[in-house]
């Protein structure tokens, strides 16, 4: 397990007045601790592992970060998992959708979860590694759990006739949600190693969905900044680049002063689901 960053002082926390916000991926875990009344992010940590789908990373994180074992006002978990399908509500049947998911992916060691997204009239069905699902259920029996795509949809996506690509970066993957007008065209997670990998996928998406590189807007969030090779590569091929703005009402404590606000967009979106 590798710690990418840990921000904030756990000694000053009163966790019973805070919300624990946690995003769990196949090779990363990040968390935020938010003061519920002031809507201020007090602490955040980001960890990675080379062993995918391994529940041990969660065990290690909880052992090494004692504050996570404290009682919280409420807990929200977002599953950042690549194996998912979005189905319009009128075509949704759980067993049929489960069969589609299992036909697309090897689901032998996975749990199938399905959740409704009423505002979009669709269901999101996805795999969660059994070891991770069991660990989280033991720790947070009364928590709120959604897929990362579901969280983004619950918060609402910007509408623009020329199209939007909302791109959120992790250390070795990025998610893309594409809208045109009020329609969702794509929600997918891609792996990457180099800036060229990111360009390849985004240019391919624009070509397949007939989106103009000149007119489409890229809204960037997560672990990316102006000086990164990824941003410089995108700047050469896309005209409209912007970093995600902070969500209304949520603030960062002084401990975060050296970090861009858009680094924590995923945590903010989890918070907005329950505030």
Regions found by a protein language model. Give the residues of each.
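Hydrophobic/aromatic-enriched cytosolic interaction surfaces used to assemble or bind macromolecules
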Residues: 1-275
């Amino acid at each position: 397990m590798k710690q990418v960053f840990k921000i904030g002082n756990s000694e000053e926390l009163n966790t019973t007045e805070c919300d624990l916000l946690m995003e769990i991926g196949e090779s990363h875990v990040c968390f935020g601790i938010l003061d519920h009344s002031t809507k201020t992010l007090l602490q955040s940590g980001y960890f990675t592992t080379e062993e995918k789908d391994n529940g041990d990373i969660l065990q290690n994180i909880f052992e090494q970060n004692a504050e996570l074992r404290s009682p919280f006002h409420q807990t929200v978990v977002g599953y950042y998992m690549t194996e998912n399908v979005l189905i319009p509500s009128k075509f949704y049947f759980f067993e049929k959708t489960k069969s589609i998911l299992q036909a697309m992916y090897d689901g032998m060691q996975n749990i199938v979860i399905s959740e409704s997204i009423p505002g979009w009239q669709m269901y999101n069905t996805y795999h969660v590694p059994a070891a991770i699902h069991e660990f989280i259920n033991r720790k947070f029996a009364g928590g709120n759990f959604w897929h990362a795509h579901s969280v983004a949809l619950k918060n609402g996506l910007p509408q623009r006739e020329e199209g939007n690509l909302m791109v959120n970066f992790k250390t070795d993957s990025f998610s893309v949600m594409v809208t045109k007008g009020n329609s969702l065209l794509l929600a997918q997670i891609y792996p990457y190693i180099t800036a060229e990998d990111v360009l390849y996928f985004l240019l391919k998406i624009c070509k397949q969905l007939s989106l103009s590189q000149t007119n489409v807007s890229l809204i960037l969030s997560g672990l990316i900044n102006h000086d990164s090779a990824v941003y410089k590569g995108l700047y050469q091929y896309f005209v409209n680049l912007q970093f995600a703005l902070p969500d209304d009402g949520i603030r960062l404590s002084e401990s975060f002063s050296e970090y861009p606000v858009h680094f924590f967009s995923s945590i903010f979106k989890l918070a907005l689901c329950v505030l």
